[in-house]
Amino acid sequence: MAIKPAYVKKTGTLLMDRYPKAFGDDFEHNKELVDELTNIESKSVRNRIAGYVTRKQRSPQQPA
């Protein structure tokens, strides 16, 4: 598993912070949301961000 670039993490985290209830653990749904909420034209970058968000949503929340 590769380490995600900083721009993917930053954009994904920003979207999850701004729209906490919008994203879920379904990649296809998250992909459509990333497409609607950003102006990213590259399909591969959109999919990377959606994949990062999906992975974060699926991971169990660990207490701080």
UniProtKB/Swiss-Prot annotation:
GO terms for molecular function: structural constituent of ribosome. GO terms for biological process: translation. Signal peptide: none annotated. It comes from the Archaea. PROSITE patterns: RIBOSOMAL_S17E. InterPro entries: Ribosomal_eS17 (IPR001210), Ribosomal_eS17_CS (IPR018273), Ribosomal_eS17_sf (IPR036401). GO terms for cellular component: cytosol; ribonucleoprotein complex; ribosome. Keywords: Ribonucleoprotein, Ribosomal protein. NCBIfam families: PRK01151.1 (NF002242). Belongs to the eukaryotic ribosomal protein eS17 family. PANTHER family: 40S RIBOSOMAL PROTEIN S17 (PTHR10732:SF0). This is Small ribosomal subunit protein eS17. It comes from Natronomonas pharaonis (strain ATCC 35678 / DSM 2160 / CIP 103997 / JCM 8858 / NBRC 14720 / NCIMB 2260 / Gabara). The gene is rps17e.
